[in-house]
Amino acid sequence: MLLAIDCGNTNTVFSIWDGTQFLATWRIATDHKRTADEYHVWLSTLLSLTRIEARITEAVISSTVPRVVFNLRVLCNRYYDCRPLVVGKPECRLPVAPRVDQGTTVGPDRLVNTVAGYHLHGGNLIVVDFGTATTFDVVDADGAYIGGVIAPGVNLSLEALHMAAAALPHVDVTKPPHAIGTNTVACIQSGVYWGYIGLVEGIVRQIRLERHAPMKVIATGGLAPLFDQGFDLFDKVEDDLTMQGLVLIHQYNKELE
């Protein structure tokens, strides 16, 4: 079975793929100090609790936190006797190479989302990922990543507002019933929610103008469903887009062996 690992700035997601479907998906806070042994104990406990008899023989990793990759490699080598495929490393091939400025490093999560998005929806595509940062990835007609946009993430914006303005509380993002808030919490929630609706609409509109094409828009990330309530922002919300991309990239590299 394949162990797919998506390490983001906030959380790290582990999924077990049996060749046809994901048997389980688990999430843990990203911590560069966490050892391979700790990962193994955590994973083994979850596998036991869910009664999944998974014999992991292969692994693929995407990580936006370089310091975490070493211990994830050790986890795979020591406990599963496999060498993980790491997206963004020279040994990892992509179906179509990104077309960006020479010397530019593209986040592996963005490359993975591009591969999955193209596989599921074809080219001329915008992938919006609501993560620690809110990213917009543009996929050309042939499946190549050709650039995009990086904006502060929703929760990051809320935290920054709370940290910079002592009188403002930390609040959770939600869809407010009205744009005009009648208390401080409602005002903040309205500003963030409607502000990000406007951000998505504006950036998508500008990308379409520059591309001279009716780009399809898909969304992923934990907060994507929140911004898909009653609006025509996205053609589709894909909950496990990154994991699907990791499986596709692993399969592609296996075929090249």
Swiss-Prot record:
List the GO terms this entry assigns under cellular component, sorted alphabetically: cytoplasm
Q: Which organism is it from?
A: Cereibacter sphaeroides (strain ATCC 17025 / ATH 2.4.3)
The protein depicted here goes by the name Type III pantothenate kinase
Q: Where is the active site?
A: 109
Question: What does the record give as its pathway?
Answer: Cofactor biosynthesis; coenzyme A biosynthesis; CoA from (R)-pantothenate: step 1/5
Provide the catalytic activity annotation.
(R)-pantothenate + ATP = (R)-4'-phosphopantothenate + ADP + H(+)
**Cofactor(s) for this UniProt protein:** NH4(+); K(+)
Binding note for cofactor: A monovalent cation. Ammonium or potassium.
Q: Where does ATP bind?
A: 6-13, 132
Task: Give the location in the cell.
Answer: Cytoplasm
Q: What does this protein do?
A: Catalyzes the phosphorylation of pantothenate (Pan), the first step in CoA biosynthesis.
Q: Which family does it belong to?
A: Belongs to the type III pantothenate kinase family.
Alphabetically list the UniProt keywords: ATP-binding, Coenzyme A biosynthesis, Cytoplasm, Kinase, Metal-binding, Nucleotide-binding, Potassium, Transferase
Q: Where is substrate annotated to bind?
A: 107-110, 184
Major enzyme class:
transferase
GO BP terms: namely:
coenzyme A biosynthetic process
Q: What is its EC number?
A: 2.7.1.33
Q: Quick one: which residues bind K(+)?
A: 129
Assembly, in brief, is: Homodimer.
Q: InterPro entries in the record, alphabetically?
A: ATPase_NBD (IPR043129), Type_III_PanK (IPR004619)
Q: Name one molecular function that GO assigns to this entry.
A: metal ion binding
